[in-house]
């Protein structure tokens, strides 16, 4: 039988068995002419392990596994077991406890509230996204590519009304409907929450029990492959939320897997998250690192995923994250840095990006930790991108203000450019900002009625012009009124009202410009691609800046007015004696403006302004945005 060889054990013990999912778990195979399933599990502290399942009446003595030393791997081949069979591992501990555990390497899981693993063949799907994958492989610098991400919770994007199964769209239904919407709007990527299997809907997928299995809420592993394949065929990239920071204590899960701390740190001061009530992975244990890295590789290489957004990175980097004095243990140098987690990130990111050019590793990191996107050999963590939480906080604080008080907080919208070159940033307005009484994006805006919509449109316009890749959570591009809830679909009926359509049309046009002009994404992380025209018009709360192209042509000039005051002849200094073509005017009727006719071309006049020899004059509406190409 011996599928798990000495070399397999050596590599697993070193933390470098990158195809580990092909060895551990459940695998359909034929031995000596007999078809069945080979099972293998890592449980070094166990006294004995059996496989129980639908094929043996869940009898604990029917299929006892053989222990392989020195790693404590248990294996067995069960004739007659087949695809779609349910199973668990029955573990007896030296002190007599009996544990019933799901398979950590399961390719498929029983639909909640069931907690069994499911035998699945994930090798039979015939992919048809070779053009996308070939192009991905040839992408030399993902930082120079457009990235406008639509963040989606699959279970609450749209639902079928009146069905008993929660009305979830299947992976195959989502593929079609989501692609249609994303293509119409102009997003380049979809970021999916809650794909790795998880038991509790209310965790949104951030308390994972199945690191190798797409959730069964929306279909089978093959259905999920179809979803990825379909989006790729329509030139849409896919990013998954991935959670190596912690895992839940559910009895069937990874916690105390073989009767002792196996996947988590044994010392509760390192192995527990007091705030979240979860366990922390032991990043110093090679087999645990291998488990996590193997999961990441599975999604990227087997499921063709284009990027992983790594959740809660700060909680991994700091030993004292969310903990009081006495609740944490310092490292060998007496510091609060988790040296093992740092090494894990460098290994993970260098490996994934080295084996898979064109794949993005994205950090949700909320502190000022240096060089998150710096190269590992220079002391960085080697992520491709980092969420810019600092920009997001300043931006939202500014937007919530009554326009009268914005002049005293003008710096909040310019500060991010002072550190923009320090990392490769993504500007994010994620699901976290529209839950827990934080209000929807629309209801964060000051004023009443029309004012809220006008504020939101100028906010999105500024965000799209600002350097950095972009992420917007679903529902915010239609000015969702309510906070998001995983228990219901988005309020699509709002699009029956013109104010909501105006916001959607504004976003659609901004995304069109974003994708059309390389100056909007090629030099996001350096000053070659950006220049302030006037960052200091505090009294009027107006910002003007340029997105510069590498060719000197097809540059864009942005002018954004954050007050309800119309500026009849607002003058803007310009860098060159050229004609400036108006390509976006927020006062256009389809965006909810007055529809007033304006010149489409503005010739630079030799009139010094903003420290420049030439300038143009423009009638800037209340909460108005103008974008000029030159």
Language-model regions, residue ranges each:
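Short, flexible loop/turn elements at secondary-structure junctions
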Residues: 43-45, 69, 80, 153-158, ...
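Short catalytic/ligand-binding loop motif for oxyanion handling, primarily in non-cytosolic enzymes
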Residues: 97-99, 158-160, 198-201, 246-250, ...
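A short acidic, glycine-rich active-site loop
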Residues: 213-217, 332-339, 448-450, 494-501
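Conserved alpha/beta catalytic core and glycan-binding cleft of carbohydrate-active enzymes
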Residues: 304-306, 324-486, 515-572, 576-587, ...
């Amino acid at each position: 039988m011996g599928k798990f060889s000495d070399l397999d054990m050596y590599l697993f013990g070193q933390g470098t068995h990158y195809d580990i999912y092909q060895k551990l778990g459940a695998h359909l195979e034929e031995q000596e002419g007999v078809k069945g399933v080979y099972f293998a599990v890592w449980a070094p502290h166990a006294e004995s392990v059996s496989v129980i399942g639908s094929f043996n009446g869940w009898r604990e003595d029917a299929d006892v596994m053989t222990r392989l030393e020195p790693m404590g791997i248990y294996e067995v081949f069960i004739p007659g077991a087949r695809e779609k069979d349910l199973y668990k591992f029955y573990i007896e501990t030296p002190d007599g406890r009996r544990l019933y555990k799901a398979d950590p390497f399961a390719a498929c899981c029983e639909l909640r509230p069931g907690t069994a693993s499911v035998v699945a063949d994930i090798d039979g799907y015939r992919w048809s996204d070779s053009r996308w994958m070939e192009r991905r492989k040839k992408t030399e610098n993902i930082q120079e590519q457009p990235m406008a991400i639509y963040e989606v919770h699959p279970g609450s994007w749209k639902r079928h009304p009146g069905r008993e199964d929660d009305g979830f769209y299947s992976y195959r239904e989502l593929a079609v409907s989501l692609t249609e919407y994303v293509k119409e709007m102009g997003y380049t990527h979809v970021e999916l929450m809650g794909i790795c299997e998880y038991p509790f809907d209310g965790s949104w997928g951030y308390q994972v029990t199945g690191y190798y299995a797409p959730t069964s809420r929306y279909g089978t592993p093959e259905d999920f492959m179809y979803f990825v394949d379909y989006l790729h065929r329509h030139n849409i990239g896919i990013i998954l939320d991935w959670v190596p920071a912690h895992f839940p204590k559910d009895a069937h899960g990874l916690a105390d897997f073989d009767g002792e701390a196996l996947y988590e740190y044994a010392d509760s001061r390192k192995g527990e998250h007091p705030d979240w009530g979860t366990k922390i992975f032991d990043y110093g244990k090679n087999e645990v690192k291998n488990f996590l890295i193997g999961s990441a590789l599975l999604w990227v290489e087997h499921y063709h995923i284009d990027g992983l957004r790594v959740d809660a990175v700060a909680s991994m980097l700091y030993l004292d994250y969310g903990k009081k004095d006495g609740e944490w243990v310092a490292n060998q140098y007496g510091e609060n840095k988790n040296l093992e987690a740092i090494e894990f990130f460098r290994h993970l990111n260098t490996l994934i990006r080295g084996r898979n050019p064109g794949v993005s590793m994205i950090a949700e990191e909320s502190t000022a930790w240096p060089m998150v996107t710096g190269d590992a050999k220079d002391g960085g963590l080697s992520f491709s991108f980092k969420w810019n939480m600092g920009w997001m906080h300043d931006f939202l604080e500014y937007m919530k203000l009554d326009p009268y008080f914005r002049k005293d907080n003008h710096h909040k919208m310019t500060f991010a450019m002072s550190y923009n070159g320090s990392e490769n940033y993504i500007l994010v307005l994620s699901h976290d900002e529209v839950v827990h009484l934080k209000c929807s994006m629309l209801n964060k805006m000051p004023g009443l009625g029309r004012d809220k919509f006008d504020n939101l449109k100028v906010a999105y316009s500024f965000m799209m012009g600002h350097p950095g890749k972009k992420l917007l959570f679903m529902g915010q591009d239609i000015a969702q009124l309510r906070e998001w809830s995983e228990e219901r679909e988005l309020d699509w009926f709002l699009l029956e009202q013109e104010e909501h359509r105006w916001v959607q049309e504004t976003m659609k046009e901004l995304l069109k410009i974003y994708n059309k002009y390389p100056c909007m994404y090629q030099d996001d992380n350096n000053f070659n691609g950006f220049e302030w025209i006037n960052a200091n018009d505090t009294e009027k709360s107006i910002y003007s800046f340029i997105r510069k192209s590498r060719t000197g042509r097809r540059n864009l000039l942005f002018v954004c007015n954050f007050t309800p005051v119309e500026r009849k002849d607002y003058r803007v200094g310009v860098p060159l004696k050229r004609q400036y073509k108006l390509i976006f005017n927020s006062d256009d009727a389809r965006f909810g403006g007055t529809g007033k006719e304006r010149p489409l071309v503005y010739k630079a006049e030799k009139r010094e302004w903003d420290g420049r020899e030439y300038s143009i004059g423009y009638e800037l509406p209340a909460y108005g945005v103008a974008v000029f190409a030159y």
